[in-house]
């Protein structure tokens, strides 16, 4: 049983979060361990497992990005791992975390990497270059703006996905799915860029 089925929901991305929360509390009371105190060990274990599933499902579905990522995995999509934890883990083992640069960001990323390398070199020598710092802050602001636009684009795609699910329009569903994958990967990459700039400016 997947998380949507657990809450008796269609695979929609625009959910009524308040209704979801209300249902969560109803199910939480129903599955509370105290209600199974006099039951068999098997029933108690089943209740604990259901309660754990409930918590995981609610935590995932109440967050729109986590909800989208989860739905895409249900659709058989493997998202690019570009999280901070994955990147840090690669660094800790001496490896290099491979990140796929969104094509539209190639030029900006190339320039940013040069600026970051210069900033790190300056810090190692105990120097500070105000102009370079201003350039990095400007770049960070630009990436923050792109993050906001990415969120707006995702909002549109969520509605397109839901409409395709309701109408059974498979081509529209696949188009929305592929576009969401690209946007989530772009969002993840942008977050890492902003983090790198913040670390360089510390």
How would you label these PLM feature ranges?
Residues 1-202:
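C-terminal accessory/regulatory regions appended to core domains
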